[in-house]
Amino acid sequence: MDLAEIEIKKKDADIVNLDSIQTFFLNEFDNKQGSPTQTIECANKCVDLAKNPEKKRAFIMVGHMNKSGEMAGLRTLEHLVDTVLVLDGESEDDLRLLTSTKNRFGPTGEVGLFSMQEEGLIEITNPSEYFITERDSGIEGSAISVMKEGSRLLEIEIESLVSKSFMPYPQRIGDSLRKDDLNTLISILQERAGINLFDENVIIKATGGLKIREQSVNLAIMISIASSYLKKPVDNKTVFIAEVGLTGELKKVPQIKSRLKELERLGYKKAYIGKCSIDKKEYKNLEIKEMKNIKEVISDVFFK
């Protein structure tokens, strides 16, 4: 870090990028580079250089994440900086999400969507094209919902595959969803809607590799599973937005009006939601079906 400081002042840099902060060290401390002491003291040195009244600079410090998805090292590092941006994504998928988890000068939770290509990170300007598969008609095992990421509303397509298991313990696989959440939804389907999955393998994923972070997608997940099990397609202009409780009842989700307006703008024709007080006349091109529970939805979608 001592040599870096000399170089920064020599070049009179306006923006400094340290990749990564854990690889820098100060000679005045005996601790190894990457240790909590070295990391914090190097970060403190960066703060001093950034706030120097004679020459103010912007510093970008790249840091590592641990396996639980938190910043590696002391939380003090997070408190030192003005903004924390987390770049998240799986190595086998192109999708990368850039999320602001701390921002002293603006809102947090905002999300940027990018695709990792040969030439680097490319902005996803049209999420609908990226996350939704273009089809002329519906297909078995597919259902669409809308999920909130920061202030953005994203269409999300859930694909499911249900197949007979010949093993004592059926497989439940969901890369986009926590296994406990998937098992809970399967149990609700079985007990509250009569979809017997006790001897069936169930695999689900969200197209594009998007992680499911909202309960509002519960209904779409369950409908996609039921569609695959019953071998009946769902109309590709129909969407499902509701949290599903353990009783099988549909619960309303936050900002339902803005979600419905966005879906109407995108050309969807029908939306299944939980009971809530909305004026259906506001949506001229979107049929809104308020349902009480998951059993009602399955009956209306597949058996009418």
Which residues does each PLM region occupy?
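Peripheral, non-AAA+ core regions of ATP-driven protein-machinery
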Residues: M1-I15, I21-K304
